[in-house]
Amino acid sequence: MNKLFYIARSRIPSPRANCVQALKMCAGFAATLPVELVAPYYPEDARRRDFLREQFALARAFDVRWVPFPHWGDRFAVRGYALAAAAYVRIRGARLAYSREPWSAYWLARAGVRVGFEAHFLEEDRRHPVWGRLVGDSSLSPALGGIFCISRSLVEDYAAAGARRELLHLAPDGVDLQRFEPAVERADARKTLGLPAGQAVVCHSGHLYPGRGIEETLDALTLLPEVLLLLVGGTADDIERLRAHAAARGVQDRVRFEGTVPNGKVPLYLYAADALVMPYTSRTPTVRAMSPLKMFEYMAAGRPIVATDFPAVREVLRDGENALLVAPDGAEPIAAGLRRVLDDPELAGRISRRAGLDVREFTWERRADNILKVLGADHA
């Protein structure tokens, strides 16, 4: 059976979403064929091999190889790693690869290795000098088996920027449904986490970077005096900044900062909530073409979702059907959406149930299987 070599573009392990997504995809691919994840070598990372499955709640095991690479200064470090990763994959005699890194994808395709490239953010990808050749050079076919974009908006952006349309495939992100089974009762989750039993709890999971709408959500608390906001994730610097913002608004006693928690523990926090908030703003750099991991986790948790309304969000969430979508960039719409689901149990239950049904189409295994079919993995 063919082995798939997955070339990550980020450090493994890391709490960043691109690390989580790479690990989950490798576990998804591993449902069908053997997988080896290739990542940049840093001594402190390679010593944490046993930490990966426990921290990230991976459904299946796969091999991991941290590849040493020449550090040619910050400007060329990425290219140095990409060359080292591609060389390693070639030395291993690979016939099938998947890459988040444009240079590696290009070099492997030039060498005749069947490879898929995963695209997440056009503006970042096209900064690589090789990007234009990767997406536009017809001589790379058939080795370059496809460019897999996480949203329809990104497919259109790539096509408009010159990518060959026949290479572009839609591949939204996914979720491990097994992590949400069996479901945990709200009261039990709150008891485990030490949360108040009788207070309305709204939860946000994920990073707390500026522009992610957390400031607007804190402002919304001033309009929701009975609500406790549970923030799961975030760096120490972001938490400090947002603590100050909460104090300035007088809501600091109704915000609980959990910081980074193991990925496998995230469902417990979602189950503890009465509502889940996804408050992206127009300042979010990736807002046009994103496919947020939290969106699928929220859907799987069976709690009502209040999300800001952007085209990429509407590819999965539908206002009044499986979520409430509200105008971005302000506290009042977020507060109004949360008020609706908190005050209307029938609405909250209906959109939650629909989201739980819809998310079954978005598992990592299904995503991996669709990609492998495009790549013709049986024939690589």
Locate each region found by the language model.
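Carbohydrate-associated surface elements
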Residues: 153, 174
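Conserved donor-binding/catalytic core segment of Leloir-type glycosyltransferases
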Residues: 5-7, 148, 196-224, 230
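Nucleotide-activated donor-binding/catalytic signature segment of Leloir-type glycosyltransferases, i.e.
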Residues: 240-267
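Nucleotide-sugar donor phosphate/pyrophosphate-binding loop at the beta->alpha transition
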Residues: 75-83, 111-143, 148, 156
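A short, well-ordered alpha-helix in the C-terminal region of glycosyltransferases
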Residues: 191, 340, 347-361
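Acidic donor-binding loop of glycosyltransferase active sites
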Residues: 254, 270-289, 303-304
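Conserved acidic donor-binding segment of nucleotide-sugar-dependent glycosyltransferases
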Residues: 295, 319-320, 324-331, 340-346
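Short hydrophobic beta-strand element within catalytic cores of glycosyltransferases
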Residues: 276-278, 297-307, 317
